[in-house]
Amino acid sequence: MEDNLEKRVEDWVSTRIGVQYTSAKERAMRLLEEAVELAQAENITWNQAVAQIHYVYGRSKGEPEQEAGGVAVCLLGWCAAHKTTFQEIALREIERIEAKPLNEIRGSLARKQDADLVHGEESAEHA
């Protein structure tokens, strides 16, 4: 069952959250959320995070697949720094979310919707 992690996660999102949340843009928003949470867990300050966002948005927009490759390389490097593997952390998280009750998943989604973090409107400044 762990052979195709992408399909496993896609199926989980589709069946537990909803097909409308499988779009590339929605997945990028969730990736941003998780990346910020990881940075926060690693003691990256608010000011450092905001400075990084200003730096990135001050440059030309990249190609999604190349940027996703960069995310993958950075995550692999983070795994190496923590003496773990991507497979290990990914499987542990997939098993954790698959075990979550549906009402807990939907509650988390509702909180994100209330905060306008799901399907939010783009800022004209950075569109």
Region spans (language model):
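Flexible "arm" and connector segments at domain edges
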Residues: M1-A68, A72-A127
